[in-house]
């Protein structure tokens, strides 16, 4: 079993952190989405992360991979049912949406400035701000470290990595404190991108 992804991808990092927390060995094979021959054969969407299994067809996207790995390991990082499951998956969706907006912004900002869509950049920046505010409002979730908290930690870590000039901590002290605690976990340290 191996994960096709990139060290800087917050979605691949979420999967890698979850795998480490579950005690699973999940090698990362770094692929370039634009040029990889293997990726579109495994995932017709040609998106990362994609999980290549030894005993079945590939699995994608990151929420499905996390659910699969949790089931494979008999873990409790993705609750099986009830309100706890819906809360965890909703928190994961919030963090993933933040990442979607941030990754899109990063790609757009790599284009020549005259070709950038300023209105779309502003819209996605607003999505990030609203998501951060929502995380601040529910930061008590960092008292545990399940799939939702892992996704949230990887999302704000991505902002630190790609948008260091846009500090999010000053107006979100509870989120900052919660993230400071979980960022010390071995799984987070082992997956920090260069």
Tell where the protein language model's regions lie, with residue ranges.
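Hydrophobic/aromatic-lined pockets within catalytic cores
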Residues: 70-74, 160, 164, 183, ...
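GST-like fold's C-terminal all-alpha helical module
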Residues: 95-180
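Charged/polar, low-hydrophobicity segments characteristic of intrinsically disordered regions
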Residues: 137, 182-194
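Non-transmembrane alpha-helical segments in soluble domains
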Residues: 66, 70, 89-92, 132, ...
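GST-like domain detector, emphasizing the conserved glutathione-binding G-site
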Residues: 1-119
């Amino acid at each position: 079993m191996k994960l096709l992804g990139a060290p800087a991808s917050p979605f691949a990092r979420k999967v890698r952190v979850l795998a480490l927390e579950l005690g699973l060995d999940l090698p990362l094979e770094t692929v370039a989405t634009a040029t990889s021959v293997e990726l579109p054969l495994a995932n017709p969407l040609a998106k990362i992360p994609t999980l290549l299994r030894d005993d079945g067809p590939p699995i994608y996207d990151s929420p499905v991979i996390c659910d699969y790995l949790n089931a494979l390991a008999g873990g409790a990082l993705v609750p099986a049912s009830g309100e706890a499951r819906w809360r965890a998956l909703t928190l994961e969706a919030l963090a993933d949406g933040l990442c979607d907006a941030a990754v899109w912004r990063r790609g757009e900002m790599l284009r020549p400035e005259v070709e950038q869509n300023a209105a779309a950049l502003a819209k996605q920046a607003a999505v990030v701000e609203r998501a951060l505010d929502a995380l601040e409002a529910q930061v008590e979730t960092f008292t545990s470290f399940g799939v939702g908290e892992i996704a949230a930690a990887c999302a704000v870590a991505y902002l630190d990595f790609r948008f260091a000039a846009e500090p999010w901590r000053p107006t979100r002290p509870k989120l900052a404190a919660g993230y400071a605690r979980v960022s010390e976990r071995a799984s987070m340290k082992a997956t920090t991108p260069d």
